[in-house]
Design a protein with these regions (language model features):
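Long, intrinsically disordered, low-complexity segments
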Residues: 19-21, 71-79, 94, 107-110, ...
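An aromatic- and glycine-enriched ligand-binding surface/loop that stacks and positions planar moieties
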Residues: 20-82, 190-328, 443-446
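Flexible, polar/acidic helix-loop-strand segments at domain edges
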Residues: 84-95, 301-364
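Bacterial Sec-dependent N-terminal signal peptides
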Residues: 1-27
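Conserved, well-structured interaction surfaces
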Residues: 38, 42-54, 80-152, 168, ...
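Short coil/turn linking the two alpha-helices of tandem helical-hairpin repeats
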Residues: 149-151, 156, 206-212, 377-380
């Protein structure tokens, strides 16, 4: 996708700051009288990108925190916010959970803004530019629907402005209605962007199985992305951007990044909050200035997975996770207590919640590993899919594989799944992968029963059941339309 014009984005922050969008799941947006030409439509498009900030603020809690990668920093907090997060961490979510509701609203707010843009596209007289805008916002809408479907199952299709009285009578659509129709090649491919191809590949890989034509289509889409010049057509690990440089704030939007949610520090209102959200509590400004929440703390489980894979050599561990920090007052390293944190999004700030780090949504290694996975499921290990698996391993500094090491489909599957976990940690991919592989319940229960933290709680942390892999429809939505079917178990 195009790089966001930050000045234009700041304008959109101000323009939309007073809008009261109602996402239950209405898509009414107040009439924009100033929308008269391509420039004003471009501002609306930038507003769609900006709305992703509200989505991402909570998405890690709906995904990474519910997996075996992230957890609460400690047991026993009594704050209301911590209890909401604790529900997501332990699978005890209730329909009244405010974070679940706010994430739902944020997704539908983005969809509403996209629909608003589409309603004004006719004022753009340049066909190429009009198609570009349409392709961009359709991508964003498809991304939000994809996440909604994976987290809730059937949800509401809103593709145009819907009067509130109509929305109150809407029913949830089936997954079949949402995915294949709303994310078809023709829909996403209009902008001819790698981000669209990559997203469609992920949709097909999630919704179909080996043996389906669209599953094979997913593999072909991955290969098209990997062979494109815009990502450098990588053939080995040395062709990829160094792992630590992928997330470097001085190297943003490098060739590894296919699509990212962008942030800008400097008190512009579009800075990243995640440094403060993820830094350890009570760190005395030794990790980051301002309040720190200690959310999304890396688990013992994932640290063990890194150490087992790399035996101290895996470069990704130190990029993604810090296990200590330096106390400048005592001039000592803090290695006990709440010292562990997700390091990937922590960078120096002058104002709290105002970081620079972008959040990668789709990147080259994701698609390389997905291609390796899909082609293995279709026809087993080969020199071709092994190349893309080893490309990622080589860059990480861990041992590569041979076909002798991975002689069977099962052996290759196990290796590529593990590599996806270590490579994409804390990018909100792990939970979706576990769902796609059908092992979310088993994996999370194994983790809950082995993580040391959970033995410190005053109550038993119970296993989750299959129905708990879906989130509950927010109670506020049910209150508006009591005829809406709630997800099983809630």
């Amino acid at each position: 996708m195009k790089k966001i014009n930050y000045i234009g984005l700041l304008l959109i922050v101000m323009v939309f700051s007073a809008c009261d969008l109602d996402q239950y799941p209405y898509s009414e947006v107040a009439a924009d009288k100033y929308v008269k030409d391509a420039s004003s439509v471009n501002n609306l498009v930038l507003g769609c990108y900006n709305s992703l900030h509200d989505v991402m603020y909570y998405e890690w809690a709906m995904t990474e925190l519910r997996s075996d990668n992230g957890r609460m920093y400690a047991a026993g907090s009594s704050s209301n916010t911590t209890r909401l997060v604790e529900q997501l961490d332990q699978g005890t979510i209730v329909p009244e959970n405010e974070w679940v509701k706010t994430y739902w609203n944020a997704c539908y707010a983005t969809i509403a803004r996209v629909n608003n843009v589409i309603s004004y596209l006719d004022v753009v007289t340049d066909e190429t530019l009009r198609n570009q805008y349409e392709g961009e916002v359709l991508f964003l809408r498809s991304l939000e629907y994809f996440n909604l479907v994976r987290l809730w199952g059937p949800v509401f299709i809103v593709t145009s402005k819907v009067p509130s009285e109509v929305a109150r009578d809407m029913q949830r659509s089936t997954v079949d209605e949402l995915l294949p129709g709303k994310m078809a090649d023709g829909d996403l491919g209009r902008a001819d962007l790698n981000s669209a191809k990559a997203l469609l590949a992920k949709v097909y890989a999630t919704h179909y199985q080996a043996g389906d034509e669209k599953y094979a289509r997913a593999a072909r889409l991955c290969k098209e992305v990997l062979e494109s010049e815009s990502v450098g057509n990588p053939q080995s690990g040395s062709d990829l951007v160094a792992y630590d440089k992928v997330f470097d704030i001085g190297n943003e939007m490098n060739k590894e990044i296919i699509f990212a949610v962008r942030y800008l520090s400097g008190n512009a209102g579009i800075g990243s909050p995640f440094g403060n959200m993820f830094a350890p509590v009570n760190n005395g400004a030794n990790v980051i200035i301002g309040t720190s929440s200690g959310y999304n703390t890396p688990t013992d489980n994932i640290i063990a997975a890194y150490e087992q894979r790399g035996a101290g050599a895996d470069k990704r561990l130190d990029v993604n996770i810090a296990q200590k920090y330096f106390n400048t007052t005592t001039q000592t390293w803090v290695t006990e207590g709440n010292c562990r944190y997700c390091k990937k999004y922590v960078n120096p700030v002058t104002t709290q919640y105002d970081g620079e780090s972008d959040w990668p949504v789709i990147r080259v290694a994701d698609i390389a590993l997905l291609y390796a996975e899909l082609t293995n499921e279709i026809s087993g290990p080969s020199a071709d899919n092994l190349k893309y698996l080893n490309m990622v391993c080589e860059r990480a500094g861990v041992s590569t594989y041979t076909l002798t090491d991975l002689p069977s489909l099962y052996d290759f599957r196990k290796a590529v799944r593990n590599e996806r976990r270590l490579e994409l940690a804390f990018e909100n991919q792990r939970w979706f992968d576990l769902l796609r592989w059908g092992i979310a319940t088993q994996t999370v229960n194994n983790y809950l029963n082995s993580e040391l933290l959970y033995t410190e709680y005053s109550y038993t942390v119970n296993d989750i059941e299959d129905w708990q892999t879906f989130l509950p429809i927010p109670v506020s939505v049910i209150d508006i339309n009591p005829e809406i079917a709630q997800n099983t178990g809630y």
